[in-house]
Amino acid sequence: MGRFIVNSTLVLVVLTTFTFFAMGQDWLPQTPSFLLKLLPKPKFEKHTLEGSEENGRVIDLQGGWLNEGKLTEMVIRSKDMEKGWDVPERIKIRNGRIRGSIRIYGLGVNGEAAKVRESSHREGHTARAQVAAPRAILLEDLQIEANHRIPLYLSPGVTGVTVKNCTFTGWSASTTVYLDAESGGNRIEGCTFEVRSGREVMAVDGSATNTIIGNRFFQARYGGIYLYRNCGEGGTVRHQAPQGNVIENNFFNMKDLRSGSYGIWLGSRQGRRSYCEDDAGYPFGSSIDNRDFADHNILRGNIFQPASDHAVRDDGSDNRILQK
């Protein structure tokens, strides 16, 4: 047992040392997500806005730091009440800096949360998730410095979020932006993505009718924007497919794109995950078909430099791809 403890401690020390050295040497972007997730997770303080009592709240940081620059998770969440979900809306956070992450959620923090999974086993899940989740949130003119966690996570059912003129830096063990199942109608505009990510920059996972326009993807070694449906993970049935999204006038730096990665990939998974059958037994959604159905999306005016045959991969159907 003593030897095990010593060995475990040594591993943690090595990983911690590797983290700081890798950041200094700009190695993290070349490190895949599964390795980055082994690194020690830093401790975050929480700043929480919960329920309708926060409706219309404006947090103007006036160019300064949220929480004095301490590593912080800003949480905007609904409150589970006896009579239903008490939902916050029309919150604005703007004009400042955040060291950490922002997560917005209702039914659950991610697609595998217990209440999300329970709801997904019945028809009408998308509507329930959206009714329960925060809506009409504005994040504007923010500088978000990531540290290990995904810096912006819109959880199942979140709708009507606008992310405008924000800059994302730092590093993430996963993606930079995650649009989770059953979310939709969100807008990401005029943002700059320079996070050293262990995966694609932006995951559109069963999220629909979003607009992603006029953004700059400067760190896209493992891909830029991927549309898919994360079939079966955690036993949750995914109902909505990543359809009706508009991806327009974005710039992608393709210089360091890794083999097998793409600037934009419509249908990046298609059931190629070991857990895809974990939601079996229900007559709808990903339970009956593990494919992504990344269909009916519009891509236009996007710029990929240098030019590459890995700019766009279309594994969906009826997508309109109009490039400059």
Label the predicted regions.
Residues 23-324:
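Extracellular parallel beta-helix/beta-solenoid repeat domains
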Residues 4, 18-21, 44:
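Aromatic (phenylalanine/tyrosine) cluster motif
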Residues 1-9:
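Bacterial N-terminal signal peptides that target proteins for export
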Residues 9-19:
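Bacterial N-terminal signal peptides
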